[in-house]
């Protein structure tokens, strides 16, 4: 994987999300750059989805807004589910798919941007052939709510 591509994707998404309605970075944040190679990232397994890993870059996905790098094994399929907060993804490697159902799911390769509104029921996963790595930004805590839990009336 090209480090330049990963860095470019992070810069583009960060710039796109630097809107006036967001507070400016504190002096400490803006004066201390974060520079880390992909091999230096510290990975944690996602408790809700065995095999998936994440490396937090900023914030805390357990409690609120965050940015992180996600790693998903090739051939992973996520059943119909939702997340309570909006999530933005920039695909770095692999082919990620998502859609309202399996029939309407679209494939997204490196460089693709996928923005999912909070509470949107969808399927997702990583196609066979290559693990998926993507930059992810959430405007609230990360959660994975299977369709039955997300909508008890179903």
Question: Residue ranges of each PLM-predicted region?
Answer:
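A short, N-terminal "cap"/entry segment at the start of jelly-roll beta-barrel domains
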Residues: 20-66, 106, 149-154
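Short acidic-glycine-tyrosine-enriched beta hairpin
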Residues: 60-62, 101-119
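C-terminal motif of bacterial Sec signal peptides marking the signal peptidase cleavage site
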Residues: 13-16
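Sec-dependent signal peptide recognition
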Residues: 2-8
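Conserved short histidine dyad/triad with adjacent acidic residue
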Residues: 63-83, 115-119
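Short beta-strand His + acidic residue motifs that chelate non-heme Fe in jelly-roll/DSBH
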Residues: 78-80, 98-99, 121-127
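Ligand-binding loop in jelly-roll beta-barrel domains
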Residues: 118-142
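Glycine- and acidic-residue-biased ligand/ion/polar-headgroup-sensing regions
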Residues: 73-76, 83-102
């Amino acid at each position: 994987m090209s480090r330049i591509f990963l860095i470019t994707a992070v810069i583009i998404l960060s710039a796109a999300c630097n809107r006036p309605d967001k507070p400016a970075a504190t002096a400490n944040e803006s004066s201390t750059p974060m520079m880390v190679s992909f091999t230096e990232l510290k990975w944690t397994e996602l408790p809700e989805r065995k095999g998936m890993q994440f490396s937090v870059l900023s914030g805390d996905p357990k409690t609120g807004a965050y940015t992180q790098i996600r790693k998903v094994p090739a051939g992973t399929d996520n059943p119909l589910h939702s997340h309570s907060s909006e999530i933005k993804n920039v695909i770095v490697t692999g082919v990620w798919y998502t859609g309202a159902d399996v029939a309407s799911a679209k494939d997204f390769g490196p460089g693709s941007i996928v923005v999912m509104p909070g509470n949107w029921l969808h399927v997702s996963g990583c196609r066979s052939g290559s693990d998926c790595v993507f930059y992810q930004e959430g405007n609230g805590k990360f959660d994975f709510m299977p369709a039955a839990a997300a909508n008890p009336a179903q």
